Amino acid sequence: MSKAVLVLEDGRVFTGRPFGATGQALGEAVFSTGMSGYQETLTDPSYHRQIVVATAPQIGNTGWNGEDSESRGERIWVAGYAVRDPSPRASNWRATGTLEDELIRQRIVGIAGIDTRGVVRHLRSRGSMKAGVFSDGALAEPADLIARVRAQQSMLGADLAGEVSTAEPYVVEPDGPPGVSRFTVAALDLGIKTNTPRNFARRGIRCHVLPASTTFEQIAELNPHGVFLSNGPGDPATADHVVALTREVLGAGIPLFGICFGNQILGRALGLSTYKMVFGHRGINIPVVDHATGRVAVTAQNHGFALQGEAGQSFATPFGPAVVSHTCANDGVVEGVKLVDGRAFSVQYHPEAAAGPHDAEYLFDQFVELMAGEGR
C-alpha cells in the first residue's frame, strides 16, 4: 500500500495512505468539527492555503454533487485534506461522483487513515501551524520534509483576499420577474461564498459582486442601497485598502453589512485591532450571544483571526459610537460589532450557513430593513 505523511511544523509526523491526488501540499493545518458539509468546506475560499483536518471519522459518504459547492466553478480551495476513514462509495441521489475522484480531478493532495482526533488534540494544545502532506514522489527524509514545511509563508501577515477574489465584476439577479429588484447591493468579494448572493436574490436584491481591488468611486457609480463585505482568507491586518474603502463607505452614510473577514474589516475601520487565534473557530455548532437581546444562536464559523474586544464594550469612532454586539459563548471571542445608530453592522460567523444552522439568517432581513429605512 502506498504511503502518505502529514508533517507539522513542530516536527510531529502522522503516517497514513494517499487520498485524492498524490504529491505535495503545503499550508496551515487547521481542523473543522462539522459532522457534515464537507463539500461546502472544501470549496469555501476562506480555506485558501490551509490543510483541513476533518474531526468526523468518516468523510465522503454523500459523494460530490453539482449543487453544494460554495465557489464559482466548484473549485476546491483547500490546500490539502486529512481524513480518518474515507467512504469507499457515494450514497446520495444527487451525487455525480465520489469525493476522491473530485480531489484527483482538481489535483488536491490528501491523506487518509491517520488518527485525525490525535491531530486535532495536538493542534488544540499547540495551535494551528504550518504543515505539509507528502506522498508518492514527494516523499523524502523527515528532516527534509520538515524543512519544506517550515520554509513556507506564515498565515500571519498573509494578504490573500486578492488571490481568491473575482477578477471581473458580475451580477447576481434577484429571484422573481426579470428586471425587478427591491434594492441594489455592492458586494466586495474578499472570498465570497456563493450562498451569500443567493440569500440576497431570494430577498429580491440585485447583487453586484466586485473585485477586492474595487475603489469607492467604482462603488459610487453603482449608486447602491447598501455595501456588503464578504468572508475571505488571510490576515485582516494586511487589508489596508479594504479598510480605507470601508471608511469611505461609512463616511458616505451607505448602509453596510459584513460577514467573517468583513467583520474584521469593519472592526478595523472603526478602530479595533485584530489578532491570530490559537486554533480558531471552524465548525457548524458554535454558540454566539447577541448582547442586545441575550439570545444565543448556534452558528457556522470559519476563522483563525478575530477582533480585540470584550462583550458589550462601547467605543468611540469617527462615525459615531460603536459597540461589541456579539461574543462566542464558549470563549468570549468577539463575534460582532456595530455602530450604535445601526448604519453598519457585522458578524464573525456565517448567517448564510452552507453548511450549518440557519439561526442567524435573519441578519439578511435586518440589512434589508436598514436599506429600506435609509430611503436611498
Swiss-Prot record:
<feature type="binding site">
    <location>
        <position position="264"/>
    </location>
    <ligand>
        <name>L-glutamine</name>
    </ligand>
</feature>
<keyword id="KW-0436">Ligase</keyword>
<feature type="region of interest" description="CPSase">
    <location>
        <begin position="1"/>
        <end position="183"/>
    </location>
</feature>
<dbReference type="GO" id="GO:0004088">
    <property type="term" value="F:carbamoyl-phosphate synthase (glutamine-hydrolyzing) activity"/>
</dbReference>
<keyword id="KW-0055">Arginine biosynthesis</keyword>
<comment type="function">
    <text>Small subunit of the glutamine-dependent carbamoyl phosphate synthetase (CPSase). CPSase catalyzes the formation of carbamoyl phosphate from the ammonia moiety of glutamine, carbonate, and phosphate donated by ATP, constituting the first step of 2 biosynthetic pathways, one leading to arginine and/or urea and the other to pyrimidine nucleotides. The small subunit (glutamine amidotransferase) binds and cleaves glutamine to supply the large subunit with the substrate ammonia.</text>
</comment>
<dbReference type="InterPro" id="IPR017926">
    <property type="entry name" value="GATASE"/>
</dbReference>
<keyword id="KW-0315">Glutamine amidotransferase</keyword>
<dbReference type="GO" id="GO:0044205">
    <property type="term" value="P:'de novo' UMP biosynthetic process"/>
</dbReference>
<feature type="active site">
    <location>
        <position position="352"/>
    </location>
</feature>
<comment type="pathway">
    <text>Pyrimidine metabolism; UMP biosynthesis via de novo pathway; (S)-dihydroorotate from bicarbonate: step 1/3.</text>
</comment>
<keyword id="KW-0547">Nucleotide-binding</keyword>
<comment type="pathway">
    <text>Amino-acid biosynthesis; L-arginine biosynthesis; carbamoyl phosphate from bicarbonate: step 1/1.</text>
</comment>
<feature type="binding site">
    <location>
        <position position="302"/>
    </location>
    <ligand>
        <name>L-glutamine</name>
    </ligand>
</feature>
<comment type="subunit">
    <text>Composed of two chains; the small (or glutamine) chain promotes the hydrolysis of glutamine to ammonia, which is used by the large (or ammonia) chain to synthesize carbamoyl phosphate. Tetramer of heterodimers (alpha,beta)4.</text>
</comment>
<dbReference type="Pfam" id="PF00117">
    <property type="entry name" value="GATase"/>
</dbReference>
<dbReference type="GO" id="GO:0006541">
    <property type="term" value="P:glutamine metabolic process"/>
</dbReference>
<dbReference type="InterPro" id="IPR029062">
    <property type="entry name" value="Class_I_gatase-like"/>
</dbReference>
<feature type="domain" description="Glutamine amidotransferase type-1">
    <location>
        <begin position="184"/>
        <end position="376"/>
    </location>
</feature>
<keyword id="KW-0067">ATP-binding</keyword>
<dbReference type="InterPro" id="IPR036480">
    <property type="entry name" value="CarbP_synth_ssu_N_sf"/>
</dbReference>
<feature type="binding site">
    <location>
        <position position="46"/>
    </location>
    <ligand>
        <name>L-glutamine</name>
    </ligand>
</feature>
<feature type="binding site">
    <location>
        <position position="305"/>
    </location>
    <ligand>
        <name>L-glutamine</name>
    </ligand>
</feature>
<feature type="active site">
    <location>
        <position position="350"/>
    </location>
</feature>
<keyword id="KW-0028">Amino-acid biosynthesis</keyword>
<keyword id="KW-0665">Pyrimidine biosynthesis</keyword>
<dbReference type="InterPro" id="IPR002474">
    <property type="entry name" value="CarbamoylP_synth_ssu_N"/>
</dbReference>
<feature type="binding site">
    <location>
        <position position="234"/>
    </location>
    <ligand>
        <name>L-glutamine</name>
    </ligand>
</feature>
<dbReference type="GO" id="GO:0006526">
    <property type="term" value="P:L-arginine biosynthetic process"/>
</dbReference>
<dbReference type="GO" id="GO:0004359">
    <property type="term" value="F:glutaminase activity"/>
</dbReference>
<dbReference type="InterPro" id="IPR006274">
    <property type="entry name" value="CarbamoylP_synth_ssu"/>
</dbReference>
<dbReference type="GO" id="GO:0005524">
    <property type="term" value="F:ATP binding"/>
</dbReference>
<dbReference type="InterPro" id="IPR035686">
    <property type="entry name" value="CPSase_GATase1"/>
</dbReference>
<feature type="binding site">
    <location>
        <position position="232"/>
    </location>
    <ligand>
        <name>L-glutamine</name>
    </ligand>
</feature>
<feature type="binding site">
    <location>
        <position position="261"/>
    </location>
    <ligand>
        <name>L-glutamine</name>
    </ligand>
</feature>
<dbReference type="GO" id="GO:0006207">
    <property type="term" value="P:'de novo' pyrimidine nucleobase biosynthetic process"/>
</dbReference>
<feature type="binding site">
    <location>
        <position position="304"/>
    </location>
    <ligand>
        <name>L-glutamine</name>
    </ligand>
</feature>
<dbReference type="Pfam" id="PF00988">
    <property type="entry name" value="CPSase_sm_chain"/>
</dbReference>
<comment type="similarity">
    <text>Belongs to the CarA family.</text>
</comment>
<feature type="active site" description="Nucleophile">
    <location>
        <position position="260"/>
    </location>
</feature>
<dbReference type="InterPro" id="IPR050472">
    <property type="entry name" value="Anth_synth/Amidotransfase"/>
</dbReference>
<protein>
    <recommendedName>
        <fullName>Carbamoyl phosphate synthase small chain</fullName>
        <ecNumber>6.3.5.5</ecNumber>
    </recommendedName>
</protein>
